Amino acid sequence: AAAAAGKSLDEVADIAQYTADNMATLAVAMRGATHPVTGAVLGELPDDEMEIGMGQHGEEGGGRCKIKTADETADIMVDALVKDLELQRGERVLLLINGSGATTLMEQLLVYRRCVKHLADLGIEVAANYVGELLTTQEQAGFQMSMVRMNDQLLEYWNAPCNTAYFKK
């Protein structure tokens, strides 16, 4: 959007760097992915456990724990991202919930609903959002949560029309 608005390459690079510096992501998995060719399970998890911080392809992450409710999981992840970004009351974020592949849109929306409430309780506004699947892993149950600290310029670019092969708004 910045390039389409006529920004120079240096300006676009600065905006991209600001975004990268003000973004954090955390994933949770309730079931590991499967290899699309061999069917081998990548990152096997017991049925009663989940892993917060698991990588996109089953890499071990921040630790395993007993399965928690969607609200409990959302709260843990929001708190971790808010801390990582050092977000303060009055700030705005872009909140993205990306389904891992075997997580339904309804489940993703339940997590999103709780995130919005928890962030509001912390005095942080969800100024923009995306809930759905952008990057998936075959048969992995879980999701990634990303937050980006928003300023007026980023919000303007996020809200600009977009029409690519995969992402449209």
Tell where the protein language model's regions lie, with residue ranges:
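C-terminal non-catalytic interaction/assembly regions of soluble proteins
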Residues: 80-169
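Mixed-charge interfacial surface used for oligomerization/domain docking
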Residues: 7-109
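Hydrophobic transmembrane alpha-helix bundles
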Residues: 5, 47-56, 64-75, 123-138, ...
